[in-house]
Amino acid sequence: MNALFLLKSKATVSVCYDDNTVRRGMESLRDSGFSAIPVITRSGDYAGSVSEGDFLWFLFDNPDAKPESVRLSTILRKGWNPAVTVNVTMDDLMQRAANQNFVPVVDDRNKFIGIITRKDILAFFYGQEESGRNGTEGP
């Protein structure tokens, strides 16, 4: 099974840019309705992901900081929610989904191409399990 089958393309995913301000990032996250959002560079590289908790801790740890003056790139946690390439296995996706709401996907040049959600990963595996029980072939 090719993981691209589950991909939500960049065009349909809410993202922030690493040069946005923290305030703009918070607004984008609120508007998205999600608890975390991918962050990319202006050239399309995946820079990381930012969560509600990242914003909360930034405000808590920096009470005098002005969110409209601080770049989003300064609050990104290194190594959190790392991206996978299109060659990722379904087993690797399942392992990532245990700890992440979505898995960012990049091409071989680290260009962000979209996400695969935990919901879609679980639905895929549930479908495989169901088809095995019914004696039919899965997706």
For each predicted feature, which ranges?
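Bateman (tandem CBS) regulatory domains
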Residues: 1-13, 68-80
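The conserved cystathionine-beta-synthase
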Residues: 15-33, 40-43, 82-100, 106-109, ...
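Short beta-to-alpha loop/turn elements within the nucleotide-binding domains of ABC transporters
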Residues: 20, 50, 70, 88, ...
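Short beta->alpha transition motifs characteristic of CBS
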Residues: 34, 38, 46-62, 99, ...
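Helix-adjacent hinge/juxtasegments
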Residues: 40, 61-71
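Regulatory sensory and allosteric helical modules in signal-transduction proteins
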Residues: 58-61, 75-84
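Short acidic DE-rich linear segments
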Residues: 132-139
